[in-house]
Amino acid sequence: MDFTEKALVLRTGRFREADLWVRFLSPSRGVITAFAFGGCRSRRRFCGCLDALNHVLVKVSSDKRRTYLCLDEGTLLNGPVRLRSDWGRTGVAANCIKFVEAMGVGPEGAADAYDLTCGMLELLETADVVPEIFPVLFRGRLAFDQGYRIDPVRCARCGMRLKDVAGVRFLPREGVFECSAHGGASGGGFMMSAETLDAVRFVQENPPLMWTDIPLSPEGWKQWGRAVDAFIQYHVGLVWDKGRFRRI
């Protein structure tokens, strides 16, 4: 599998004195790990471009037995500037990247994941204000894009428009919303206000650069966070634990 294309560096690590492994997100192949032999020293082949969050044009080949990938060359396309000096924003980016890695992205969902992750970095690089709950917004949208999409428009039981009812409950295990007419017959779940439902729709339909305009109250943010974390825990099997995402 030999190819040349743009990619986003997610993480790197050293496995010998002069060699690196590089994990990157490709818009056509998803999350891939390749070995950059001489990556710590070769300025001609890599030009110092293998820092996390850099966009790089990569040239990748397979070894003779086709058991692993080799990163032969990398050319820096662009990299963040503000993120390098703003630790708060760096932390938000790191949290989002960890989720991309933990969830795993294959070729089928690669384009959406790449666009979303690039949009996340653009917002963190350019926006004046970053919502505190941004990592949770990102996790929800990535899950939606990778096949776990939910319908925040109609009740899953009767088809009634959720905008037209007074109370709505979200059921994480089923991944559906039901209106108050059913009285929580399924048991469990979380009550969702109209503003939180609007936020779910907005995040599903718009890129990250527009998420700074979501008019949610503190209670609305709490509802979103509880619902998304419970949904991802049940369907994706990931929880945030001691600074990392852990499979359960």
Curated annotation (Swiss-Prot):
Protein origin, superkingdom: Bacteria
One Pfam match: RecO_N
One GO cellular component term: bacterial nucleoid
Alphabetical GO biological process terms: DNA recombination; double-strand break repair
Keywords: DNA damage, DNA recombination, DNA repair
SUPFAM superfamilies in UniProt: ArfGap/RecO-like zinc finger (SSF57863), Nucleic acid-binding proteins (SSF50249)
Cited function: Involved in DNA repair and RecF pathway recombination.
Family: Belongs to the RecO family.
Alphabetized PANTHER family for the sequence: DNA REPAIR PROTEIN RECO
Protein name in UniProt: DNA repair protein RecO
Organism, scientific name: Oleidesulfovibrio alaskensis (strain ATCC BAA-1058 / DSM 17464 / G20) (Desulfovibrio alaskensis)
